[in-house]
Amino acid sequence: MKIAVALSGGTDSLFALLLLLEQGQDVFGLHARFLPPRADQPSGNPDPAEAIGAMCARLGVDFHAVDLADAFEEAVVAPFIEEYVVGRTPNPCARCNATMKFGLLLDAARALGAARLATGHYVRQLRHPQWGMTLQRGADPAKDQSYFLSLVDRARLEQAVFPLGNWRKEQVKAELVKRNIVPPLPSESQEICFVPGDDYRAFLRDRQVRLPGPGPIVTMRGRKIGSHKGLWQYTEGQRRGLGIAWEEPLYVVSKDMENNVLLVGGREHLAARGCLTEDVNLLVDPADWPAEISVRTRYRQAPQPARVTVGDTGMAVRFREPQTPPARGQVAAVYDAEGHVLAGGVILGPV
């Protein structure tokens, strides 16, 4: 069975390739160019495809590169911009995994003769006695990426390989040092690959996106206490960056897009009982879900016990304990007690 290994040039994907090679797997390297060359790219920086291709040549591995920049702009970047225009907080990494890495890149791998696509994600793929193929949280809690894969179609995940699921990041780095192998592009990837410096505000300004302007900041009691810089710059639950000195810490409670009002309040106003989602991706039939399940609505959040009802148009999540309001546009990932991913959906808003 031939396996394509998605190579970004960094530590994780390189070690995934090495592990498969050491297992005797029939592999080739595959790099996707998701972004056009930057006009301000420093002259000394290597072209990623050339650097990765040279590394594969040293390892005796065939290498292919595919240009998916136009598709990435349409499927990931354009929706990212539109989400901010309408006041949501998008999750482009989850969208990219669903549409690009395990969408078009997997298609490219299959066209090149691969049966599966391996990536450097820290997530486990297991065969469950009742559910068949399942996705499970990675062994490294600090690097687990199951949350970002919860929107990937089950049939696509069945064609994936995740060699790093049982590894921790520090182990991966140590093993590369032991093997005296340096990644061609060793710097850690930034949070959003197409946003320089992870500064989404500057990115949107540079794109000359027409965004809602300033408006009033109003407390939950209806008192105007300041002005915001545009609702797109704020997220539910946010505390920092409000620019207001107040008698108590203030948080963003909600965004009134129709009236361009930012509603703020104390921590006691952040008690969301649940959330609604759309674009639901079921990895396990809800009829087979266990009684005890939990939900993550943010990447760094520990899964929170909840009840989840799946309907024709989405999921309704009801937390056991009140939570910080889930941000519209983010992902709600559903887990069982062992960390198997049961479903994912895009958050419409808190309830």
From Swiss-Prot:
Site for Interaction with tRNA, residues: H121, Q330
Active site residues of this protein: C96 (nucleophile), C193 (cysteine persulfide intermediate)
EC number: 2.8.1.13
Signal peptide (residue range): none
Interaction with tRNA: annotated segments: 143-145, 298-299
InterPro entries: MnmA-like (IPR004506), MnmA-like_C (IPR046885), MnmA-like_central (IPR046884), MnmA-like_central_sf (IPR023382), Rossmann-like_a/b/a_fold (IPR014729)
UniProt entry keywords in alphabetical sequence: ATP-binding, Cytoplasm, Disulfide bond, Nucleotide-binding, RNA-binding, Transferase, tRNA processing, tRNA-binding
Protein location: Cytoplasm
Residues annotated to bind ATP: A6, L7, S8, G9, G10, T11, D12, S13, G120
GO cellular component, one term: cytoplasm
Record's protein name: tRNA-specific 2-thiouridylase MnmA
Designated gene of the protein: mnmA
